[in-house]
């Protein structure tokens, strides 16, 4: 079993946010292969309620096909983690609605950790991902004290531009970095 070395401050901060009595939005970003995903998985082990990793855009042809691939993969994550009796979403707004349904179904009152890895890969051109994600956080997550939304990505400029320094829908609701 692997262990984390030299990340005590990060683990302490993640634990503090986990124990918070309000909704928390955390963004973890940085170069590829430095252990972002490993850090989150080790910090939360069996406490992750929903987890999804975006599909690499490499070898995906056409904007429409990339969006379809991302939505299909997200749908399979929903099914694998307990959602039943639903069709594949056609839009990101619908996909996040299905995630809300799953989270309500799984809610037992304890902290729900949602981990979206490689988040920038989900935002394909003209997919409507960012407004749907903003609606998910602003309209649903931020009203629930037991939600901890963690996003991860190696596309630092995307994370900074669209989440942490956003002047759009996440303005003043930007994540802890």
What do these predicted regions represent?
Residues 1-177:
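Phosphate-binding site recognition
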């Amino acid at each position: 079993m692997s262990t984390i070395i030299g990340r005590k401050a990060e683990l302490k901060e993640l634990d503090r946010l986990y124990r918070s009595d309000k909704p928390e939005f955390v963004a973890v970003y940085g170069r590829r292969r430095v252990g972002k995903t490993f850090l989150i998985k080790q910090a939360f082990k069996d406490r992750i309620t929903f987890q999804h990793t975006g599909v690499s855009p490499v070898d995906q042809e056409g904007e429409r096909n990339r969006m379809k691939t991302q939505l299909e993969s997200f749908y399979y994550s929903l099914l694998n983690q307990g959602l039943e009796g639903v069709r594949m979403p056609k839009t990101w707004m619908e996909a996040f609605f299905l995630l809300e349904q799953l989270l309500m179904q799984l809610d037992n009152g304890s902290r729900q950790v949602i981990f979206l890895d490689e988040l920038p890969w989900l935002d394909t051109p003209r997919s409507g991902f960012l407004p749907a994600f903003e609606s998910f956080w602003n309209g649903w997550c931020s009203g629930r004290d037991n939600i901890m939304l963690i996003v991860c990505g190696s596309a630092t400029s995307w994370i900074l531009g669209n989440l942490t320094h956003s002047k759009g829908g996440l303005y003043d609701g930007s994540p802890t970095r």
